[in-house]
Amino acid sequence: DISEFGGNPSGHSLNDVFKRLEYCSKPLVAAINGITLGGGLETALCCNYRIASKQAFVGLPEVNLGLLPGGGGTQRLPRLTGPSEALKMMLTGAHVSAKKALDMGIVDLLSENVVEDSIAFAKEKALKDSKHPMVRDLNDKMIEARGSENVLVEAQAIAAKSRKGQFAPGQIIKCVEAAINLDDFDEGLKKEGEYFLECLMHPQREAMIHIFFGERSASKISDVPKDTPTMDIKKAGIIGSGTMGGGIAMCFANAGIPVHIIDQDEDNLKRGLSVIEKNYDFMVGRGRMTSEQKDMVFGLISSSLDYKDLHDVDIAIEAVYENLDLKLDIFKSLDEHVQENAILASNTSGLDVDAIAAVTKRPEKVVGTHFFSPANIMRLLEVVRGEHTSHETLATVMSTSKKIKKAAVVSLNAPGFIGNRMLFNYTAQANMLLLEGALPHQIDQAIESFGLNMGPFRMMDLVGLDLGWRARQLSGVESPLHAKIGDHLCDNDRFGQKNGKGYYNYSEGSRAPNPAPENEEVYEKISS
């Protein structure tokens, strides 16, 4: 039980139980059905044989909790798959399909009737064989890996890229290194126990488990009953084909949900669709999808210039820039053209959702859905609950967020909601450091060395400096000192990655940030 990590252990140790299983005189067959992760898979690895249903998935995802597989997983899995594949599986926390698990050597057979076949298999082995294989004795792949540093170097590269700043990945690598180099399996288990205890005592473990439970509790809304009916979102509509609109459209298409984009400007629409296709081409080039998959997913996205073409969508999401008057006009048009039972959502990052709902005849169907840029990559989704938003609307959006692989958090209708209220002070302090003489790459490097994937200036360039700039222009209020940097950059056509120059410069076709010394004069001028 994850909630028990860090508590006082009681009873028999897991490894004592597993050792009894391994040395049982009768053949043990693990019948794997559904999703078998962590200790479940480690239990199966102690059995002599493993039979899985074709729909099963297995994995050792403890790294996601700041831990390592502490029930012998780091010692047994490499003996079946080889250390390289085991390390990839444990460092990524990936869930592996039954078919792939068979190919990797984790399971012995696949079955349509896993329980019946496992019982029959155990009886057959009991009658035929007196000795049964124990994973702990399979040393060939360990001996083969000795003397070669390639496996461990490759694992360290994976950890550095995908788990930057995390403690547990290094411990997992040390465990597998012990499995490779130690002749005594039980000595390897002792090393695993030592490294597991270090993970258990590390503050990252407590923080990552907090995140694990936090994400799950965020999806539960105390005053919305679990049995609240939800709509089936079969088709989505997006208003706006810019950075946000295109990214949101990709979220739905990636989930297999047809999506229709409309825009007032034909050139903008063509440009937006071109960006979407380039994003998919980039994924094909990186091996994240095949050309056939790209054609199928991109084929789910249609477009036009007319609100009437949204008549059959189940949810319409407005994704234009932050101008309340413009959004009010859009919602009036949506209310007129979209079917009566459809949800109307706004991707506003901080405007009044109740004011938007008030111009419609269905305020109970209006909700804020604040995606973070780039919407097709960032997991967080703020679901903004208006005064009249119904339980059904809220439950439907929360359910749909899981389908499009978002971690949804419900926010009340307050200025800036949750995320932007936090980011405001974060980016303000970053800009103040510029005015004190630090440079963007120095600040970003400091933040990234602490463990964040991206520093504040890389983040702002990715999101687009023009978003905040337009909002400040519309507010009519003079920008605070720290925001004048962004204003000046935008006044000089520096919007970030989208046009190749912001706090950094970007080469054509590249997202790698390069220093922009021409900006230093701006920082000095504003600070004086």
Residue ranges, per PLM feature:
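Acidic/glycine-enriched connector segments
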Residues: I2, V17-Y23, T43
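N-terminal glycine-rich phosphate-binding loop for ADP-containing cofactors
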Residues: F5, P9-S13, C24, T36, ...
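Conserved catalytic cysteine-centered active-site region
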Residues: F18-A30, G34
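Active-site-proximal alpha-helical scaffold in enzymes
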Residues: G40-T43, C47-Y49
